[in-house]
Every structure is written in structure tokens, then in C-alpha cells.
Amino acid sequence: MPRILAATAGSFVLKAYFHRWRSLVILALLLAPLLWPLQYFAERYYSEQLAEQNRQTLDLYVANLLGTLRRYEELPQILGGLPVLRQALQQPGDPLLQKIANEALADIRRRTGADVIYLLQPDGTTQVASNWAQADSFVHRNFAFRPYYREAMQGRLARFFGLGTTSIKRGYYFASAVKEGSRIIGVLVVKVDLEHIERLWGNSPEQLLVIDNYGVVILSSREDWRFHASRPLSAAERDEIHANIPYPVQDPKPLRLQQSAWLSQSRTLPETGWTVSIYAPRTLIERPVRSVLLIGGATLLALLLLLTLLTLSRRHYLDRIALEAEAKRQLEERVLERTRELENANAQLQQEVHEREQAQRELMRAQDEVVQAGKLTALGTMSASISHELNQPLAAIRSYADNARVLLDHQRTEDARGNLEQISDLTTRMASIIAHLKAYARGARRAPENVQLQPAIEDALSMVASRRRAMNVELLRDVPDAPLWVQAGETRLRQILGNLLTNALDALAEKAPPRRLWVIASQDQHGVTLTLRDNGPGFSEDALAHAHEPFFTTKTTAKGLGLGLAICDNLLRALGGRLEMGNHLEGGAVVRLHLLPGVPGVAAMPQEETRA
């Protein structure tokens, strides 16, 4: 009898356990579909995060690419005015002159970092080139078939990307006509090597590519994508490719990409007609999504196990409740203790999740700030600022040279000698400006010096005097006769004043006469204030809000890069001063320079000039 009861009880227990586990399996199957919305939202979240990251990366690389191109954009026009190059075109039979021109281009190429600089005759034959002494010299080679030659001969600034037929190297070409009056006497070409940008792209996990106006990949972080067509080419496009030879292949093969495997973003560059795209593999999304699914599955499993434990505990409690009350009390205490542990663990987990999310937000914000600071630093130290800073002394040199020519025609040699001395002083000043800008790019800091303000004002006014008189601008000065000593540097102070006076004349050029320019200096217990005012159109609200930012300008690209006020602001800050801008109540712009007071009668050695 006891054996029968025991067997019956055992069979009952087995059926009960089987029933419980079957219920748990059914519950698990019902909860499993909850992982699908978890996967959907996880993919959406990480896709948005990756898209934002790709956008920032694309902005950074686009800024780098445009910065590289803009660095050389105006170089052909500037070099086209060099007398030695003009003489080389006018006297092609003079071997000594040709050698001097070749060496001049080679030196300019080394200093600017360009790949090749060469000068074409009107028929497209290379007269002089920076690589004249190399095996792949361009001298005596004809490039009349190139589109940049044809566009430059039409008087336009030409752009072209293609494969060099002589060097077999890819490059971006800028070309500009060299004119003698209205007659085109040649074409100056600057070739820029962009392969270093590809090498920079190769260090990132994303894949970047640049597509030209034909739809062909010309730059890419993957070599097997280069010179493949991203879309079908028309017959006319194929004919142009055969005629211009922009690629090492005459018939680009289609670029076969499995779009579903990539997350892409693109940016069009109107200046070049290119499209820059970034491709990130979707595996960057799949990995964190799998982690989320694993965590979600583990959470569901933990819930099932918890339900199992609770069910078994409850069943055990119900089975034994009739046998002993003490066991009931102990079981209740155990369940309560376990519940408290789970609650504590859950609270701790929530706290850790909150801290992790907060740390992630802080990290992303810090990364955004670092990226923005890196872009401003890279853009602020580009050598484009050199051409901007040299515009004023170059314009003054041209004016003095034109006046000297007229004076010599009238046999006024003493006056002409004075102009030549002014030109010599300006070239010394240009060398000092270049030395200072190099130190500025390296982040060097020199202590301010005790200098007089009046000589710097006179120098800056003399640099723009010819243009001011030509524009019929009335100069109104209110500067004390007693020396005003400030803490500055002579070169830096002249740079700042020259930039601001040039900006004032640019603004007055947009206004009909009468034109007036005020220069006012005053001193108080806080320092020296120099005020420059004009009766031009004044600053707009947008200009006042962004004037201190690099590359912000209301001028066209040919008239300015937007670096002048940013450079003046940085120089003044380095001197302990500040720059204020506003509009006068009677109309026109007002710019105030606040400078720290210097020690009267104590002039330090001009470190900027001596070290230049």
C-alpha cells in the first residue's frame, strides 16, 4: 500500500513539473516576438547615430578638400603678373632668361607645395616649367588639347582634373591667361597633387569617394573603386573623355556597389561640379544591434527564469503550507530577501545605464567641440592668409612703381629714387609680414613691445594713399602731436591698420562721393583707443555677428578670403588688446582698436623684424 501511494505521488509530481515547463515554453514563444520591435528601434537609433557621425566626417573632409583647392585657386593669376615670366614669353630665344624663369617657377613650386607650375605659349606649347630639369619635363610639350588651355585662352580661370599625359600622375589644374593689355600672350598653369587627401581618407573606417561631372570616381579611399563610372555614360560624354584624356582608362567600367551593404551620404561641390560621398558599412550598425538583441534576449531569459523561480517557490510554499507554518515563514522571508536583492540590482543597473548615457552625451559633445576647433585651426593657419596680408604692400609697390616710371619719363630722378626707396622698404616689410605669419601658424607668441602709435598710422596711411587719392576720399585726422606709446609690435600694428584701412576703402568704393575717412586717437587711464570711421554703407547685422569668424566675407571670392578681420582680431588678442566694430549714428562703419598703454620713451628692439 505505501508503495502504491508513493508511485501515485511520484506520477503526480512528474505530471505537475511537465505541465509547468510546458507553460514556460509557451510563454517564451509568446515573448520572443518582442525582440523584433527591439531590433527595429535599435537599428533606427544606431543608423541615425552613424548618419550623424558620417555627416560630421564628410563636412571635415569636404572642408579639407576645398581648403586645399582654394589655396592654389588664385596662384595662376598672381604668378601671371611676374615680370620674369612675361619676359620669357616675349623673348623665347633668350636661353639665360628661360633658365631664370624655369628656376623661378621651381622655387615657387617648392614654397607653395604645388605639384608642377608651367607657362604655355599662345599655341599651347610649354615655354618654361618648374620641372624643367627633370626627366618628365613639360618644356616644349604641347597641351593645346587640354580643356584648361582652351578655357584660359578665352580669358576665364580654368579648372580641370585629369591624368598627366607626361607624368602619368593625377592632378587638379588651375589655369589663367597671361595678358599684355587686352592681348593674351600665354597661359600659366598650376597642377595640384590630391593623392595626399586619398592617403588621409585611407586612415578612416569609412570609404570616401569623389565623383566628377561625368559620374566617374576620380578620388577614393579604395583603389579598386577609382575610375569606375557610377552611372551609365552617354555617347557625348564618352567622346569628351576620349578627347580630354582625364583618366588612365578611356572606357570607365561601371562601379558595382551593393547599396544595401552601405549607409551613404553625399555633398555636391558647386565650385568643381564634384560630388563627395561617404560610405559606411552596415556592419557598424549590425554589431551594436546584435549586442542589443543579446541583452534583450538575456533579459527575457532572466524574466523567464525569475518566473520559474517564483512559480516553483510558490508551488513549494503551497505544498508545504499545510505541513508546517515555520517553513511558510522562512519561505516568505527568503522570497522577500530575494526580491529586495533584485530591486537593488535593478536600481543599480538603472543608475549605471543613466550614468553611461550621460557619459555618452558628454563624449559626443566633446567630440563635436574638438572637431570644430580642429577645422578652425586648420583653416586659420592655411597659407591663404599670406596672400591676403601681402595684398596691401603689393598694391603699394605697384603704385610706387607706376609713379616712378612717370617720374623717370619726366627726368625727375630724385623723386623716382624716393619711390624706389619706398618700394625697398615695402619689400622689407613684406618679408617681416611673412616671418610673422609663419610664427603665427606655428602658434609662437612674442611679448608685446613699447612702440609709438603715430609712425604706424603714417605707414599704414602711406600704403593706401594712392588708392585713397584716386577714390577722392577726404582724410580727417584727430591724432595728438605728443607720442602715444602702446604695447604692440611694429609689424603686427602695421598689418592691423593696413587691413582695416583697406576694408574702409573697399566699403567707400560702394558709395558715391563725397567719401570721408576719419582717423581718431585718444588716451585714458585704461590705454590708447584708435578709432577708424568712414561714411560708407556700414556693417549689416549678419556682418557684425560673424565678422570675427575666419572666411566670413561680404565680398566676392576674387576680392577677399574673409580672413582680414579674423587675423586682426587674433593679432590684437595676442597683444592684450581687443577689436570692436559697430555703426555710427550718422551712418558708416566704426572700428575701434583698444591697445594697452606702453612705457613712454622706452622702445624695445623690433624682434619681429630682426628675426624675419
Swiss-Prot record:
Protein EC: 2.7.13.3
Record-level GO cellular component terms: plasma membrane
InterPro entries on file: dCache_1, HATPase_C_sf, His_kinase_dom, HisK_dim/P_dom, HisK_dim/P_sf, Sensor-like_sf, Sig_transdc_His_kin-like_C, Sig_transdc_His_kinase_DctB
The record's account of how the chain is modified after translation: Autophosphorylated.
Keywords, alphabetical: ATP-binding, Cell inner membrane, Cell membrane, Coiled coil, Kinase, Membrane, Nucleotide-binding, Phosphoprotein, Transferase, Transmembrane, Transmembrane helix, Two-component regulatory system
SUPFAM superfamilies: ATPase domain of HSP90 chaperone/DNA topoisomerase II/histidine kinase (SSF55874), Homodimeric domain of signal transducing histidine kinase (SSF47384), Sensory domain-like (SSF103190)
Swiss-Prot/TrEMBL GO biological process terms: positive regulation of organic acid transport
CDD domains recorded: HisKA, UDM1_RNF168_RNF169-like
Pfam families: dCache_1, HATPase_c, HisKA
Superkingdom in the source lineage: Bacteria
Coiled coil: 328-376
Transmembrane spans: 23-43, 292-312
SMART domains: HATPase_c, HisKA
Annotated compartments: Cell inner membrane
Domain annotation Histidine kinase: ranges: 385-599
Keyword Nucleotide-binding: yes
Residues annotated with Phosphohistidine modification: 388
GO molecular function, one term: ATP binding
Bilayer topology term: Multi-pass membrane protein
Function: Member of the two-component regulatory system DctB/DctD, which regulates C4-dicarboxylate transport via regulation of expression of the dctPQM operon and dctA. DctB functions as a membrane-associated protein kinase that phosphorylates DctD in response to environmental signals.
Official protein name in the record: C4-dicarboxylate transport sensor protein DctB
Source organism of this protein record: Pseudomonas aeruginosa (strain ATCC 15692 / DSM 22644 / CIP 104116 / JCM 14847 / LMG 12228 / 1C / PRS 101 / PAO1)
